[in-house]
């Protein structure tokens, strides 16, 4: 997926170079009627997190946002010189890597091919990565000649995803917080994989802004907040909801 987004971004740069020299009569007429078209590329920085952090997570020991590319096409209709509405189609990745120290954290490890569920106390390493097709819809406001603000909502469909990792330097209480103790110390690890429990459909809110750096070139920033858990409703191993929260930073070319 990452390779595909890089290829698309290179194609986008080629389109920019061509578009600087060629603007069709159709685009000129559309602009006169209040229509605006933009191609965007960016990077998502953030992660999936419970809000607020639950008592089970005692310490965040490490965080890596990874490279989460995005590519987007946007159509905007300006209803007045100040107000407009827009719809986009976005291909994007969202992910992160974290290291945390936890206590009585819901867990199902894989030990010698068997799944053992219970409550983990110790260190947890998590890798999360998903690819989405996203449809954002927003209300736009021209704050000044070069500044534009937007507020809206989005719906996303997850095409693929991974939520996995390992536990180490701690112990698992099987079944309950007072169950049989299984220890993993001195570098021993046990893996886990919750990828099959990831939800396909996501929705949420967005707020963002754009600055027109040049005649057709914009710098964009947008914060998205997912309103539903990244896991399916019937997944009970992790006892708290995890919400995708990401800041997208990038650039765009409007025709």
Range-by-range predicted roles:
Residues 211-215, 243-255:
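Outer-membrane beta-barrel "beta-signal"
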Residues 35-37, 67-73, 133-137, 203-207, ...:
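Hydrophobic, lipid-facing positions within transmembrane beta-strands of outer-membrane proteins
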Residues 19-38, 81-82, 104, 163, ...:
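Outer-membrane beta-barrel biogenesis signature
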Residues 82-85, 146-149, 215-221:
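Repeated loop/turn-to-beta-strand initiation elements of outer-membrane beta-barrel proteins
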Residues 77-81, 141-145, 213-215, 255:
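Outer-membrane beta-barrel strand-turn architecture
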